Curated annotation (Swiss-Prot):
This is Ribosome biogenesis protein BMS1 homolog. Residues 132-135 are annotated as: G3. The modification Phosphothreonine is found at T708. The modification Phosphoserine is found at S188, S552, S625, S639. It is found in: Nucleus, Nucleolus. Residues 219-228 are annotated as: G5. Its main location: nucleus. GTPase required for the synthesis of 40S ribosomal subunits and for processing of pre-ribosomal RNA (pre-rRNA) at sites A0, A1, and A2. Controls access of pre-rRNA intermediates to RCL1 during ribosome biogenesis by binding RCL1 in a GTP-dependent manner, and delivering it to pre-ribosomes. GTP-binding and/or GTP hydrolysis may induce conformational rearrangements within the BMS1-RCL1 complex allowing the interaction of RCL1 with its RNA substrate. Required for RCL1 import into the nucleus. SUPFAM superfamilies: P-loop containing nucleoside triphosphate hydrolases.
Amino acid sequence: MEAKDQKKHRKKNSGPKAAKKKKRLLQDLQLGDEEDARKRNPKAFAVQSAVRMARSFHRTQDLKTKKHHIPVVDRTPLEPPPIVVVVMGPPKVGKSTLIQCLIRNFTRQKLTEIRGPVTIVSGKKRRLTIIECGCDINMMIDLAKVADLVLMLIDASFGFEMETFEFLNICQVHGFPKIMGVLTHLDSFKHNKQLKKTKKRLKHRFWTEVYPGAKLFYLSGMVHGEYQNQEIHNLGRFITVMKFRPLTWQTSHPYILADRMEDLTNPEDIRTNIKCDRKVSLYGYLRGAHLKNKSQIHMPGVGDFAVSDISFLPDPCALPEQQKKRCLNEKEKLVYAPLSGVGGVLYDKDAVYVDLGGSHVFQDEVGPTHELVQSLISTHSTIDAKMASSRVTLFSDSKPLGSEDIDNQGLMMPKEEKQMDLNTGRMRRKAIFGDEDESGDSDDEEDDEMSEDDGLENGSSDEEAEEEENAEMTDQYMAVKGIKRRKLELEEDSEMDLPAFADSDDDLERSSAEEGEAEEADESSEEEDCTAGEKGISGSKAAGEGSKAGLSPANCQSDRVNLEKSLLMKKAALPTFDSGHCTAEEVFASEDESEESSSLSAEEEDSENEEAIRKKLSKPSQVSSGQKLGPQNFIDETSDIENLLKEEEDYKEENNDSKETSGALKWKEDLSRKAAEAFLRQQQAAPNLRKLIYGTVTEDNEEEDDDTLEELGGLFRVNQPDRECKHKADSLDCSRFLVEAPHDWDLEEVMNSIRDCFVTGKWEDDKDAAKVLAEDEELYGDFEDLETGDVHKGKSGPNTQNEDIEKEVKEEIDPDEEESAKKKHLDKKRKLKEMFDAEYDEGESTYFDDLKGEMQKQAQLNRAEFEDQDDEARVQYEGFRPGMYVRIEIENVPCEFVQNFDPHYPIILGGLGNSEGNVGYVQMRLKKHRWYKKILKSRDPIIFSVGWRRFQTIPLYYIEDHNGRQRLLKYTPQHMHCGAAFWGPITPQGTGFLAIQSVSGIMPDFRIAATGVVLDLDKSIKIVKKLKLTGFPYKIFKNTSFIKGMFNSALEVAKFEGAVIRTVSGIRGQIKKALRAPEGAFRASFEDKLLMSDIVFMRTWYPVSIPAFYNPVTSLLKPVGEKDTWSGMRTTGQLRLAHGVRLKANKDSLYKPILRQKKHFNSLHIPKALQKALPFKNKPKTQAKAGKVPKDRRRPAVIREPHERKILALLDALSTVHSQKMKKAKEQRHLHNKEHFRAKQKEEEEKLKRQKDLRKKLFRIQGQKERRNQKSSLKGAEGQLQ
């Protein structure tokens, strides 16, 4: 066996190491490098062939020019929005697995379910928004319009599927993004050779569809259900470093790929009408162009909307800090996917929502109280209304009684009677009813039962019933300091009014929560309420609810024993009503605090009450936005504060009666506090002049705001907006000067009165700038401003003319001239520099370089325009710029969008231009797709995808003739363009579109029916169709004929006088005059005389109107799982098929077999004179006619006798039998020979086998003999040697 030659070592001939060796070798040989050789011997390096050099130069220039793209202005912001990466492919090809692996590669996190877009940080300056695209044609169209990069997954074991080619065609129409193919299922190939062939075949087919050299990535196999880490890492590096060219539609329109949706509709409106339009807020990164507030947007699959409000939020997936580093740390590897439930933090415009993982809302099962509350919430009318409309029948034959028939004496409110408790020494307030003395023990039990029932009924009553009860109670005991407390309630109610104009639903919720807190404070201040501590806990749990549970008098009587404890708990619970939103831990903590506070001394309670009063006084009174501040309101406010102070003093005196000693001088106590309160009352009574003149006084309360900010877990602060911001729109505009008696400024005396208020007016001598400058001594000589080029000359002395001084002052004052001079100087310097560069610079700059330089300058100007301003100011000027994370509020959204929301389908908000929201006539150039099997018919409804929209319309197809006529086509032509006109949304010219017959379900064949581009947007097009009018001649003269059957009246003939007519045979004519009889007949003149069999026709053109039908595709409003089943108007053929209506065929339109008569041609007759003149070869060869055979040469017919016929028949039968026997014998002989051949072959094989064995035996014996002979010869040789 020969050994294989080892592969020889090949020396490295390139690279830095080889270059060093070569240089060292040349130095050793004292030859030097190539540059030295060029200097030493330039002729050796001269041009050998000018033609070859020109060819190489042209080739290099061609290669350079091929790489050029038309430069565009770089409009990408400093913090660009995330790159949209669409992972597209057929079902079961590995899309979700690839997304999970990419997310794990970049963020080290694993997502269990991918729903909606997922935003991740992939590098120091790049973020990615990855979204999955299914095989629904609606989703494919929408994502192709916003994609920056498409990862097209291809099952290598199956090959290309139809969805791949459909998506490629969609991308070609709507602006071609970057496309990278990814081959999966490569581990299914067993043989490496087959794998290589498949890769090559798929790569070249992919290059045909995209462009030669398009990147095709290979994922070889899976390990534990995931792709290999190194391959995913390489794919991620390709995505991270990829460059993107801006697409025209995306850069000219703002758009948002929403990653979060929230319903802001009032729950009460939803409860009363579940089908009401919704108000939703959508969140996402703004891409494309700048977006202005209140602009028009289109949501594909839903419809057109106007932006109600837009605001920018902090970036939830911000780029890492701008510092030099080689890689990202673990904290900076962010992922943000709200629809997938990842991140845990949701950003709103005035709050940050943190997901605590369900630790604070754990509940084993829903209790019966929860079901009761839900049943109360679901009612559409209040219980009072139901009770008022209800009737009860006491007896079978009695009249039904209503609520108005019942005496209201039983519902009287209790009266208050103060009694001194001898055991405790405190004043107690007893509730006495009118019939208490008359009722007995049995009645008390019934009253207790009735009071319990009333308590249940009142527990479900609304606010209005409760306020009426409170008003009646205050009327009953006005003598016991109820008036002041009622004033306090009214004041707090006015403070807690809802704002007239809320910025958002969050403000409404906050205001409702404050109203709930105010009601709780009122309830806790009334001493007849029961168990104030429990009330505080329940109020803190359900702050802001519209209705509170009412209390019956019986409950108050039963709980009067614990009144002292409830009062102490109420005082401790009052300061805790700052926020109605608290958790269960906070509730238990408040209960513990209330128990601890019951043991406080009276002095501590007084100090706490003082602090509460001071806090309430320090807060500015909240006035509704529709209310104006005036002096009367100011006085009422101060009087209410005084009443509050007096009432609080009386309240403390009543509580401290049992603790103070009798006869003590109360006026000496707390003199410092009383003095402070008196000073405070004096300050409140003094009018605030600044507030009266300028309106609302905005003071700097940063320190107070910092103190009042609440912290959540020490991590986040609750961002509460300034309350005064909501009332700024309705406050007094102090910048507007209201003129009651305008001055006549044309009068000289009026102008002189304000002349000294302006710079150009006449000033006093000591204040006049010109005179002061004239008096200055000459300190400096002439000097020139090198920056602006202005020359300033010093004045010679104080006697210089005043005109020169005034001129110089004007030059210094005028900023426009200074700016223009500076600009001229800079232009002059720039031109000088360009001249210097053109003369002395060696590197020649091409036109392409100059164009790129201009684009870079424009990009720098665009960035520097608003660079120094903050975001809020920039938004007012240029709108919301791309890269911002914005929150958009949209009103009047169909309820199905919220109810049938599916996060797997993308929500895109596409901004519309000024005229793109209108609907009109659109003309376009269309071509039926070569892969679509059917042809398209005019007036058949079809779905177009133009711009952001997908809609159904009825187009008319036409073609332009050579004379400019737009002729209607019934069907689209094959393999060529035609025109199409339809009624639809206005779209800019040059926008691509595609047409689909249906978006419902999966069609078996290619779904894209046609593609094209928008041409024109006006109604000037006039589409006509051909109409042939036929008639018949009934009188024929020489060149004149009377024609009938073409028209119905003489008026129609008059309309067409002078029109050109023609016969089927081609004779042209003209219509002359109408005839009296028959009706519609006319006289016409022709080129030639007609025949009665001729048919006369006139070709006319009839204008066709374009159907005004526009139906947007609302696929996102369909239920979940049915979003790919949207169907609009059906075609005529579909309707016939659905209803089983067969088309009645027109007999004249049917194809009939062509019956042609066979023509018999006569023989060619050549005259004899011509035959003589013809040459011999062309002369007809005449042969003599065959004569009749003579009778003697004719053979007579043999007629056999019957006996002979029998013998002949017998011989035929015998010959047939003999031939049959011979055939059978031949077959048997063939079989015998075959068997004999087989036997001989078998014997031959056995013979060969025996011979082979015999040969082996002979050769073996012969070999043994030779070995023995060889051994014997070796032994003999050894013996001789010895």
